[in-house]
Structures are given as C-alpha cells and as structure tokens.
A protein has these predicted regions:
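His/Asp/Glu-rich mid-to-C-terminal helical/loop segments that flank catalytic regions of hydrolases
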Residues: 92-148
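Metal-dependent peptidase/peptidase-like ectodomains
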Residues: 1-94
Length: 148
C-alpha cells in the first residue's frame, strides 16, 4: 500500500469511460497555470479535435471515505488528485457507453481508431509535460478535508 509514496504522486489519471476522444480537462485554480503550460501544444496537434482547459468553479469535493466506485478511488481517499480528462464524441459516432460497458459487447472492435489515436497523443503529451514539471501539482482546492 506504501502510503509514504502517495504524497509523491501529482495526479492519478484513469481512462475507463469508453472510446470517445479526449477534449479537455477541468482543474482547480491552483493547478490551472501548471496545466496551461502542460497543455499548450494540444490545440495544434489535430484540427479535428480542439482541447479546452477549464478552471473548476465548484467548491472542493469531499475526500472519499471508501475505495469504491472506480480504480481511482483508493488514490482519492488518500488525498491523491484524481482529475480525469473530459471526453466527447464530436464526430457523432454515437457510442453508447451504457449499452456496451462491461458487457459481452465490450470488445476491442468497438473502439473508434481516430479517437483512440488522438487520445493517446494527448495523454502522452500531458503525462510527459507533467512529469517534467519541477514540482508536484498543488492539491489546494481539490478536496475539502473538513467534511466528516
């Protein structure tokens, strides 16, 4: 479980939402400037898919108390940021996540190649640029540690 290592993780990214394309990310204000730098090249890699960086305007979310719901939950309940990419279907393939997800139809051939290719590039650029920051992302404004 290595709790001493969790404080060294900038963010846990979990891609488990169907074969749609990554179109943006929404981050707390304290992370915005870092993500602006990290995401700078993303709008120029494919004119078919824009990338939008947004500041989260909602209050910090409660720190989860249990490790249920998804793969990221254990990290979140231990205070690790678990910000995910925003995804969409701008070309209208009409992928129905709830019809396919975790069923016998949840197979590789349901993937949308142009979405997966673009998302792979976006993910690689963001991971590389985050990994090359000289500091971890701020956790300020992410979790409300006072909610019991």
């Amino acid at each position: 479980t290595n709790p001493e290592k969790l404080v060294k993780i900038s963010n846990y990214f979990n891609r488990d939402g169907g074969p749609t394309v990554t179109k943006g990310i929404t981050v707390p204000e304290a992370m915005y400037d870092d993500f602006k730098k990290v995401c700078e090249p993303l709008d120029s890699i494919n004119p078919d898919f824009s990338f939008e960086l947004n500041k989260r305007t909602s209050k910090p979310r409660p720190l989860p108390k249990t490790a249920g719901g998804s793969d990221h939950a254990y990290f979140a309940m231990n205070g690790v940021p678990t910000i995910s990419f925003d995804n969409g279907d701008p070309k209208g393939y009409d992928f129905n996540y709830m019809e396919i997800w975790h069923t016998e139809r949840d197979t590789y051939n349901m993937s949308i190649p142009e979405y997966m290719n673009h998302t792979s590039v976006v993910t690689a650029i963001v991971m590389y640029n985050l990994g090359n920051l000289d500091h971890l992302l701020s956790r300020e404004g992410l979790y409300d540690l006072n909610v019991k």
